[in-house]
Structure formats: structure tokens, C-alpha cells
Amino acid sequence: MYTLHTKRVKAAAREMWTSNVSKVRQSFKNVYHKCKIRHQDSTRYPTVTSDDCNQDDVSYDGKMNLTVVLQDVKTAQVELFSQMTDIVHAIPKVHEKTDLYQKQMEVLETRMNVNEDKQGTTTKDILSMKEDIKALKKKVTELEKQNSYSRIHCLEIPEGERGEEITELLYKLIQPATLKNTLASTDREMSSAEPEKVPSYPKSTDHLEKITISPQIKTLKKRNHQNASRNFKIAKPNIYIYPDFSTWIKLTFVHGGKWTFFLSATKLEEFIQWLLSRPTILPEEPQVITQRYCPFTGLILSLTTICLSMFNNIYGFIRSLKEEVTRL
């Protein structure tokens, strides 16, 4: 812009100079032609010199023309001088502006270089972050595989008729096991109670032994039943929804000791109806199985959140740098 401005000023000065010089030359040419014509007239007609008045008039007219020409030349020179002074005064201002703009351009170049360096560092950081994220993903997949190959036994219930068949099989398998557990517990309590409370009688009194033992067995059975009902009321079945199995639900029930399995969310209503329809068999010692906690889940979640936050910060920083560059 400033180079064009200086070029325009120079061109205007040249045009003014050439126009004024051409005017001066034209005025000199006119005077020269007039003088030449008069000189030719005087040489052609030398006899016509009778009137001195005419000669005086011619000389006066020539002097007048010369004075007018000189005045025109002076005015043109004054105009040229004023215009040249204006140009001379404008040139340092133009130089100052060009210096200022050159400094601003240098500052912008330095900023652009700094921004390019920052962009290079940010790209390197992003690439390193991508590599770290890939490594974390690999670790997460390895941990998921380790968790999948753990000792948890999952019982999958498919859709349709197979689900009903599997529930019936479970009912058949669980019911005899619960009955065996209850009978074994009652037998153990009876055997433990007999040597303590029953006195030793001779072999001939078998009928009396039966009579004396039967009320004790009845009281033990009643106590066992009451304790089992209390424990059953305290230890209710728990339902755990695991984050690793998004569509599977782990059910832990107290019926017949320890037994747990995983059930699909779509088959949960059918399973609840089956549980309500089956007879209630109270166990001897109910046990509530707590949820297994994986120690790597919290660490993985924290690492992923940190990586995502760092990636968002770097992306925001790059966007701000781009906005600054576009503004500049």
C-alpha cells in the first residue's frame, strides 16, 4: 500500500513538472515566433519606416508580451515550488508510516512463527496422547478378557422355549439339594442334642426312650424353623446390575445355601413368576453373597477421564490459536 502511495505521489509530481515545463516552453515558443514574424516583416519592407509611432507601438507590444510571459513563468514556478514543498513534507510522513507498518509486519511474522511452533508441539502432544489412548485401550481389553476368564459361572437363558426348559431343570436340581441340606442340618442338631439332654437307660426300656426323646426333637425342630424363618427375613435376596454385563443381571438368592446365576433382562419377569409359583423351602443357615469388586475398574475409569479431559483441553487450545491467527 505505501509503496503504491509513494509511486502515485512521484507520478503526480512528474506530471505537474512536465505540465509546467511544457507551459513555459510553449510561452517561449510563442514569443520566439512573434519576434521572428516581426523581424521578417521589417526585412521584407525596409522602405516602410516612415512612421516612428508604429515602430514604438511594435516595441511596446513586444515588451508587454515578454512581461506577460515572464509573469506566467513566475506564477508557474511558484506553483511548482509550493507543490514540491508539499511533496517534500508528505514524503517523511509516508516514510514514518512505512516504518511503522514494517515493524507491525515483523511483529506479526514473529507471532506467526511462535504459533507455528506451538502448533507443532500440540500436534506432537496429540500424537503422543493418541498412542497413550491406544495403549490404554489395549490394557482395558486385556483386563476385560481377564475378567471374562474369571471363575464366575454364568448361566445364560435363551429366548423362547429353551428358557422355560432351563427354569424347570433348575427347579428340579435345586429342590433336592435344599431338601438334603435341611435334612442334614436337622440330623446334625438331633445328634448333637441327644448325648447332652437324654439320660442313659438300660436296653429294656426302649419305649420310654422314644417317649422322652420325641418332645425334645419337636422343640428342636420348632426352634430350627423359627431361626431359619428369622434369618430368611433378615437375609433377603439381592439383585446386582453389573456395568460389565450391560444386558445381564446377577441374581443371588438364599434358597438352599449358595447359588447364583446371570439372567437376561428380558426373561426377568418369567423368572420372578416361576419363583412365586414354586414352594418356599427354608434353609438351615442362609448366607448372603456379596458382589465381587474388580480393583481395576476404578483405575481404568480414572485414566479414561483424565485422557479425555486432556484431549479436550488441547483441542480448545488449538481452536483458540486458530482464532487468534485468523484475527491477526
UniProtKB/Swiss-Prot annotation:
Keywords annotated in UniProt:
Coiled coil, Phosphoprotein
Q: Which residues form a coiled coil?
A: 122-151
* Classification via InterPro entries: Ccdc54
Here the segments flagged for biased composition (Basic and acidic residues) are 186-197
Q: Where is the signal peptide?
A: none
Asked if the keyword Phosphoprotein belongs to this entry, the reply reads yes
* Chain spans, region Disordered: 186-205
Q: Which residues carry this modification: Phosphothreonine?
A: T182
Source domain of life is Eukaryota
* Record's protein name: Coiled-coil domain-containing protein 54
Q: What is the lineage of its organism?
A: Eukaryota, Metazoa, Chordata, Craniata, Vertebrata
Q: Which gene encodes it?
A: CCDC54
